[in-house]
Every structure is written in C-alpha cells, then in structure tokens.
C-alpha cells in the first residue's frame, strides 16, 4: 500500500487548523499529516502539537520564511521517511478534503496532479472580482510565457510522486511565494513527467487573514519572467 503524506504549511492558522485536521481524519483514507509551522505568533504550532498522534506530525521552523521553503523542508522530511505520494494543501479551509480522493486516484498513473480551479468542473467560491482577475491573469501569463499547457499553475492543491519530489529537492528551487508552484510545474514538464489536471472547488477562507500580498504577486511575476528569459537563452 502506498504511503501518503499531506503537508500543511501554516502561519497564524489557529482558527482553522483543528477543523481541517478533523476533516482529514474523517476521510476513509490511509493518510498521514505533517504540519510545517513558521513560528506562528497566534499559537498555531502549539495547537498542532496538541493534535499529534500516529497520523500527525509537526515541524517547527524558526521564522516565517515563505511557502516554498516550508514545502521543501516538508519534502525532505517525507522522503527521509519513505512516503510514496506527497500532497500539497492549504490549512485555511480553501481546499476541500472531500476532493482529495479524486486527486489521489489520478496520482496512481501520474507524477503530478494539479487541482484545477479554471477548468470545466472547477470553480471558485466567495472571491471578489479582483482576486479572480489576479489569479486568472497570473496563471494565464505564466502559461503563455513558459508555454505550459496547464490551466492553474498557481494552484496549491496537488499530489506529487516521490520521484518528482526528489527532482524538486535536487533543483534547489529558491522561490518563496506562489512562484514556487509555477516553478515546480515547469520542472515536472521539462523533466517529461506525467501531469494530470483534476477540477476542484476553491473556497475563500472564512477565518483568519489571507497570506496573499502585493510582494508575493510581484515575486511570482518576476520569477516567471526570469524563467522565460532563461529558457530562451538556454536554447541559443
């Protein structure tokens, strides 16, 4: 039986963590959970510690250092313990645990499954128009300049094979924010790995504060542009 690990990066998710953990535990799936907390001042790390058991583990990081580094540390932890599939998932309730099974089914024949908002069957609930516009423009821009045929490059609900995770760690990706997700897909695509897209429903958080900032958006845009230029130069 495949070993499956869900990685939940957290920063100030005290209002959401117990609920998402409870929902995951209610699934009839053989899964384990790793909370990677960036020293949340609201006590998220301590809440995670109180929930530890045979199916839940916690990594405490010294400071808030971004999504990418949190996942990279979680990936290393997962490979060291022999997991076959690693799930990326938000801890704020935006990603529905009930949809995890459909992603895992697709993972049996692929290296990367992208939970996709912007495809038939996918949708976004409770987002203002400007958040939709930023997300649609960002993923469309990245897909265009990087020539990638995927509909949701910044999606944070994914399943990765251990082979892809190993490649990601070897690549030493430096991006901290959502650009990390774009770079990960590019790496999988250029490595000729099998990639699938599965529709998901994305819910805007009802508690806590979004981590999306102008700085994160700019970093993702700049990183995508740099990756595009780098690819063009390497072809010469």
Residue spans for each PLM region:
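A conserved acidic beta->alpha catalytic loop
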Residues: 37-46, 93
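Short loop->beta transition adjacent to catalytic acidic/histidine clusters or analogous donor-positioning motifs
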Residues: 2-4, 25-35, 43, 55-56
